Amino acid sequence: MEYKFGEYGGQYVPEVLMPSLKELEKAYKKYKDDPEFKEELEYYLKQYAGRETPLYFAENLTKKMGGAKIYLKREDLLLGGAHKINNSLGQALLAKRIGKTRIIAETGAGEHGLSTAMVGALFGLKAKIYMGAVDVERQKLNVYKMRLHGAEVHAVQSGSKTLKDAINEALRDWVETFEDTHYIIGSAVGPYPFPSMVRDFQSVIGKEAKKQILEAEGRLPDSIVACVGGGSNSIGIFNEFKQDKEVKLIGVEAAGEGLDTDRHGAAILKGKKGVLHGMLSKFLQDDDGQIAETYSISAGLDYPGVGPEHAYLDEIKRVEYAGITDVEALDAFSTLSKTEGIIPALESSHAVAHGMKIAKEMDKDEIIIINLSGRGDKDIHTVMNFIEF
């Protein structure tokens, strides 16, 4: 477990949080390789969440692009509609092991809030979800589902009323309640041990994808593409391929209305080093070094920073990062829906858009895997404003 990735990561937190982080680190080290814990997690991932997910050859999309073979890792088929359940199940089982009776979470697109509400119901843990008021408005369906599972949803009215503000509130809660509460951070962000732990729970994506592509093609892919907000779905699929230097790894950030505007969420492409939410990483900042307002059509990609491992992988040039605009993401949303009968989440549509773009430039015997991190049901209301029939 990495305390830091190069200079990124660490624990930049108030003293009062150190005991809970130490307790969590100790518990995670104890259980992560414990056969009983692993068996229980595997049981729930398979029987409850629906793993393993298919690696689907998108034949129609491949033909339409006229280049590389495109495979989709179908995390959108999991219970709750996204990859988030992989991590929520792992952390909830850990919370139970250390005697916590309450769980809290932050959420942007509502997917992580939903998966946390689900595991709260499953394991009899009281759940409270913090969500920016702006996101509550644009993700009504997920908010309703969370409440249906018995979770309390708190609409955060401070700051930009989006994900970063929800994290601030959740951290405040945890400072006061950590004796009986576990904070299930939803992305590979935050103070150590969260980035390593979330990556480990999400790495099941890459482990499966590697096995599946070897079965399907007898070799590794040429490129893997995944969207990056905080960066958990991407680190989950990249992790298993980090050592395979011949595999190009591409993280796709939200370019919003354009990288030359101030309305985007591209923390790696346009951010600077800074400290927020307990970690040193790359963040979008204004001229005074304050955290800048972010923007993306997709609620899950408007975090103003990125997980510390991504900042490091960018620095050592192991992962290439690209930006996709709202317009390009909407086009990919529509294209995948029409050509394959699969409606992707707006977050995942950013990865699909970039995958489509590079597939055209590649040879027909080359292979791309796109991580389809979630499905688009939650985004239909947003998309209706842009795509009309």
Curated annotation (Swiss-Prot):
Modified residues (N6-(pyridoxal phosphate)lysine): K84
Catalytic reactions of this protein: (1S,2R)-1-C-(indol-3-yl)glycerol 3-phosphate + L-serine = D-glyceraldehyde 3-phosphate + L-tryptophan + H2O
Cofactor annotation: pyridoxal 5'-phosphate
Pathway: Amino-acid biosynthesis; L-tryptophan biosynthesis; L-tryptophan from chorismate: step 5/5
EC assignment: 4.2.1.20
Subunit-level organization: Tetramer of two alpha and two beta chains.
Protein name: Tryptophan synthase beta chain
Gene: trpB
Coiled coil: none
Family stated for the protein in its record: Belongs to the TrpB family.
Pfam families attached to this UniProt entry: PALP
HAMAP family (alphabetical): Trp_synth_beta (MF_00133)
GO cellular component, one term: cytoplasm
Key words of the record: Amino-acid biosynthesis, Aromatic amino acid biosynthesis, Lyase, Pyridoxal phosphate, Tryptophan biosynthesis
GO MF annotation terms: tryptophan synthase activity
Main enzyme class: lyase
UniProt signal peptide: none
Free-text function comment from the UniProt entry: The beta subunit is responsible for the synthesis of L-tryptophan from indole and L-serine.
Cysteine disulfide partners in this protein: none
